[in-house]
């Protein structure tokens, strides 16, 4: 069997990936139903496609946790040693694992985003939630790319940390807290924050969106890069972290 086939079987041999996928999809779709349903109940016409995606970041966090656990669980129970014995080329094994997890995360991201848009359209009443612009397609279809790249980052962090609690803490605090705290640095904080990796991932999705009731600044109004350059920058972070993780894994004991 190929490395990817083995990694797929290993991933789905436990319940946690299934639970993570269900929770990720439920969060995005559930929040879409709540927000658009509330706007419809108040006869508010300002529901937009952006309003259907409030749960996307939480779902992204859930899939990052799943990706990290795919690695750290093997280190925890020592099964990674057996895997390395079966596939002496550690980079090939870890890249296979990364490919499986990233592909799965990307699919979940697409299902969650378009599912949220579909449910939001049902609950939004008279609001026009038709996908009319390239920016709106980018917001929905782009979730798959962002989820996949986030999973790559999560696997890399899992390889580097090797401990579940530590890896999960980093992956949750990094986008939700650390990148926001950067803005508090005197004089240069705002400029540095524009180059934060997850901020650029959000920038790729949010540029050109109609934020509706969320306000013009909901997705950030001052971007350092255009949307596709922001995606490339985010992908560069994912690739760099993965290269560091692969180098580290090749040099230390399992």
Map each language-model feature to its residues.
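Helix-capping/transition residues at the boundaries of transmembrane alpha-helices
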Residues: 10, 72, 83-85, 154, ...
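Secretory targeting signals
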Residues: 17-68, 94-162, 176-189, 202-236, ...
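Membrane-interface capping segments at transmembrane-helix boundaries
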Residues: 246-254
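Hydrophobic/aromatic positions within or immediately flanking transmembrane alpha-helices
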Residues: 21, 81, 94, 168-169
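Generic structural signal for small/hydrophobic residues in well-ordered secondary structure
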Residues: 7, 87-89, 93, 157, ...
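Transmembrane helix boundary and interhelical loop/hinge segments in multi-pass membrane proteins
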Residues: 67-86, 90-91, 98
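Aromatic- and glycine-rich beta-strand/loop motifs that create alpha-glucan
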Residues: 1-24
């Amino acid at each position: 069997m190929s490395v990817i086939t083995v990694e797929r079987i290993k991933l789905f041999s436990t319940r946690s990936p299934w639970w993570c996928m269900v929770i990720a999809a439920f969060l995005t779709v559930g929040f879409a139903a709540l927000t658009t349903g509330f706007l419809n109940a108040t006869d508010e016409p300002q529901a937009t496609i952006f309003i259907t995606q409030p749960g996307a970041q939480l779902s992204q966090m859930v899939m990052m946790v799943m990706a990290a656990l795919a690695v750290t669980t093997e280190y925890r129970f020592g099964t990674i040693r057996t895997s390395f014995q079966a596939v002496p080329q550690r980079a090939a094994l870890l890249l296979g694992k990364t490919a499986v997890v990233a592909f799965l995360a990307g699919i979940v991201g697409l299902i969650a985003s378009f599912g949220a848009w579909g449910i939001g359209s049902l609950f939004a009443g008279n609001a026009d939630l038709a996908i009319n612009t390239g920016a709106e397609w980018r917001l929905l279809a782009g979730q798959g790319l962002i989820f996949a790249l986030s999973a790559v980052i999560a696997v890399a962090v899992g390889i580097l940390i090797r401990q579940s609690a530590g890896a999960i803490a980093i992956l949750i605090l990094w986008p939700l807290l650390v990148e926001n705290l950067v803005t508090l640095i005197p004089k240069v904080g705002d400029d540095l924050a524009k180059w934060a990796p997850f901020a650029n991932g959000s920038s790729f999705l949010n540029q050109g969106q109609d934020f509706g009731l969320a306000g013009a600044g909901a997705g950030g109004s001052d971007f350092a890069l255009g949307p596709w350059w922001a995606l490339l920058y985010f992908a560069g972070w994912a690739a760099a972290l993965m290269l560091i993780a692969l180098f580290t894994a090749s040099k230390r004991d399992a």
